[in-house]
């Protein structure tokens, strides 16, 4: 790991990782115009059907919550050339469903759940590209509060070396804690045998746009420290901001 502008490097303040398991279902259904998702009737139809499926999943004893998200914005990221060289499809997921289970072992029982199977079929029959992975939590600032009317981040990290992503993330997350008052963040690491297009996926939230977006657009150290360290360590960071499906 190489740290650029190391005088700015402060590690994030972390809690002990959670024992929860995570099932992430991400779908690219509509198109994008720059950083914004274009209106798409197929996306609207899918969103109308996802809510009842999430409710059915949430009623399981081994499921802590099942939450659906719709994309609203792609903030500045890093690594488009790296993705192109590696032949990796860029993350353009406009719908995400995140299922949190009581433990990692509980994820196996979800594979045959009828609501999960219906959800997968719905996304695969409608989406241009679907990414599904089961994951554990290697690190967290705090559990992400899905009950709040917040702006939710999923950042899809690609790198050949997962440990490098984790090491760099500790410092970039520290920057976000200090510069944007980041209240929560939970890393998801694909389990052995699961699709690992993304070495790690970071999930986080902020209470409002003004708490984080101005820093991404106007604070110089976002580019000279955060994006520069991703670039120096050959990490493709692909952040997308979502709103929770009500």
Q: Predicted regions span which residues?
A:
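Conserved CoA-thioester-binding segment of acyl-CoA-metabolizing enzymes
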Residues: 115
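Ligand-binding face of N-terminal immunoglobulin V-set domains in extracellular IgSF glycoproteins
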Residues: 112
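Short S/T/G/P-rich N-terminal loop/turn motif that feeds into the first structured element of a domain
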Residues: 1-94, 102-109, 126-246
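Short basic (Lys/Arg) and small-residue
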Residues: 118
């Amino acid at each position: 790991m190489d740290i650029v502008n190391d005088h700015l490097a402060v590690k994030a303040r972390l809690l002990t990782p959670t024992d929860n398991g995570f099932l992430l279902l991400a779908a690219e259904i509509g198109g994008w115009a720059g950083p914004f998702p274009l209106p798409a009737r197929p996306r609207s139809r899918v969103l109308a059907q996802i809510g009842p499926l999430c409710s059915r999943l949430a009623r399981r004893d081994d499921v802590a919550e099942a939450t659906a998200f719709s994309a609203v914005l792609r903030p500045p990221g890093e690594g488009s050339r790296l993705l192109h060289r590696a032949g990796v499809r860029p993350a353009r997921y406009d719908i995400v469903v995140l299922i949190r289970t009581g433990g990692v072992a509980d994820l196996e029982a979800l594979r045959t759940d009828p609501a999960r199977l219906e959800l997968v079929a719905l996304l695969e029959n409608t989406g241009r590209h679907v990414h599904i992975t089961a994951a554990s939590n290697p690190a967290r600032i705090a559990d992400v509060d899905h009950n709040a009317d917040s702006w939710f981040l999923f950042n899809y990290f690609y790198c050949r070396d997962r440990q490098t992503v984790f090491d760099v993330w500790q410092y970039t997350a520290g920057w976000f804690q200090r510069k944007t008052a980041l209240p929560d963040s939970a890393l998801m690491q694909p389990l052995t045998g699961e699709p690992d297009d993304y070495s790690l996926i970071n999930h986080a939230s902020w209470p409002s746009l003004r708490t984080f977006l101005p820093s991404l657009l106007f604070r110089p150290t976002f580019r000279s420290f955060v994006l520069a360290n991703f670039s120096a360590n050959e990490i493709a960071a692909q952040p997308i901001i979502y709103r929770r499906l009500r």
